[in-house]
Amino acid sequence: MAGKGEGPAIGIDLGTTYSCVGVWQHDRVEIIANDQGNRTTPSYVAFTDSERLIGDAAKNQVAMNPINTVFDAKRLIGRRFTDSSVQSDIKLWPFTLKSGPAEKPMIVVNYKGEDKEFSAEEISSMILIKMREIAEAYLGTTIKNAVVTVPAYFNDSQRQATKDAGVIAGLNVMRIINEPTAAAIAYGLDKKATSVGEKNVLIFDLGGGTFDVSLLTIEEGIFEVKATAGDTHLGGEDFDNRMVNHFVQEFKRKNKKDISGNPRALRRLRTACERAKRTLSSTAQTTIEIDSLFDGIDFYAPITRARFEELNIDLFRKCMEPVEKCLRDAKMDKNSIDDVVLVGGSTRIPKVQQLLVDFFNGKELCKSINPDEAVAYGAAVQAAILSGEGNEKVQDLLLLDVTPLSLGLETAGGVMTVLIQRNTTIPTKKEQVFSTYSDNQPGVLIQVYEGERARTKDNNLLGKFELSGIPPAPRGVPQITVCFDIDANGILNVSAEDKTTGQKNKITITNDKGRLSKDEIEKMVQEAEKYKSEDEEHKKKVDAKNALENYAYNMRNTIRDEKIGEKLAGDDKKKIEDSIEAAIEWLEANQLAECDEFEDKMKELESICNPIIAKMYQGGEAGGPAAGGMDEDVPPSAGGAGPKIEEVD
């Protein structure tokens, strides 16, 4: 075990549309199936008037409850409400989004009759809790430690927010790793037996909501990322959107009605489009069939693979740009790539594959790893390495990842002065000496940015802090050392020191951009606990209700059984029948009763039925072997297999 008495460490691929969890066990990675038997779980959370649903249960009811079912939290995490991508997504999401403090997007849902607000971190934490529970059910132990993956092109705020989601979920996030790098581990272990010497591998990871390309060299268990590129807002969902818009227009043309204002109709259409998209990866044509889509109108429409490709061709072509950029940054020629590895469900689209094959001059693509599971697989390996589990096969692996965006600070005139170039191997540390811009300047404002543009206003402000107390001096005399330090999670710390006075100040890039404070996270952790106990309460209630229902129906069947019914005295039989009918009526009228009410009802019913049934068996005339006596208080099993008759010595 992890040597910490906390069960093994797990690897979680927290995806935009689906998530997946793996663990290192018996010298290999086990990808764990959920309670529905699926190895990937929808990244959906639904709120109803009586409970909270996560995963398959949430996605399955989305058409009935579109406005309170939240998905795509990954497209919100670490972003501002005013972000252009958030604004374009709002038009497509059925749930309500509002701007919270510091422009943080907040999701508004109705839960148990009250309006509640959740941040993207909280929604993501609920999915992480679900993934942890899936692993705990399989392993039979509690789990504390996890490695969580993020798109390689996630920026600092998105990484930090994902880490916060882990904290809210009560997990110790040992490491945040990049998805393509995790997939490369899966590829490397898969190929280990056969490969000799250095290999240049391009990982092409096109998922439900994000897109990454990473170029690595792999040799003898050393995975070195040379360059990474991508788009944190491009994936399968965008292809679905194009198809949905196409059919909304089609419906308008055929029926002169606009369904775009009806969340339920749109959701049913989207589900059908997602299914059609998958079908078109293996066949050339399919039909969308939805009964009573809108105003009682049935919608049947064919779609061909060619039409689907035409609707998305600009997006598919857009997928090739990061591939070129990645090769340029790594200063490599496309002919020097040994393997092109497909990761993410959207790489099953034939057109995407064809464009890649054409780009690499007819080179065959590597499809030997499972595109849905490779990322969780790699995360599970990394979790095993970090917790000292696993055999020598994995303990010798070394991961050298890079930072995806250049980091620097603003100098006079709004110029971006870069300290750490993009694609620098992490962890890394860089120092540079700056000075004051005007005479007797008492302090300097250090503004930290990430991005590739020459002017800071075109880049992303990560945070700022003041270094004050500089003694009066002419401009250019004070010496201020600024140090940028990136840890293994790709998260940045910046410190500044005035050489003459020894004045210091530092910042872990946090609160400036809607980052959660320690207190907020603590509060969310407590809320997560509260929701968990509410979920458990609800489950208890459902179990108690089912137990009562089963008992009543089984008892009814028992006395209707001729063999038993005829052995009962008339008034006894009537007594049981009346009490059962009363119980069933009560059940129908009180579906939402409390757990203890169901339990009391159950006891009341048992106190009437059990003695009568027991008396009958004591007569020794029942079909079974006659027992010398009967335990009066035998409770029926909660599973409700009817009155449980035990032999007593």
Curated annotation (Swiss-Prot):
Interacts with GDP-mannose 3,5-epimerase and SGT1B (via SGS domain). Binds to the deubiquitinating enzyme AMSH3. Interacts with WPP1. Interacts with DEK3. It comes from Arabidopsis thaliana. Its main location: cytoplasm. Residues 619-649 are annotated as: Disordered. In cooperation with other chaperones, Hsp70s are key components that facilitate folding of de novo synthesized proteins, assist translocation of precursor proteins into organelles, and are responsible for degradation of damaged protein under stress conditions. GO terms for cellular component: apoplast; chloroplast; cytosol; cytosolic ribosome; Golgi apparatus; nuclear matrix; plant-type cell wall; plant-type vacuole. PANTHER family: HEAT SHOCK PROTEIN 70KDA (PTHR19375). Disulfide bonds: none annotated. Belongs to the heat shock protein 70 (TC 1.A.33) family. DnaK subfamily. CDD domains: ASKHA_NBD_HSP70_HSPA1. GO terms for molecular function: ATP binding; ATP-dependent protein folding chaperone; mRNA binding; protease binding. It holds the Pfam family HSP70. It is found in: Cytoplasm; Nucleus matrix. This is Heat shock 70 kDa protein 3.
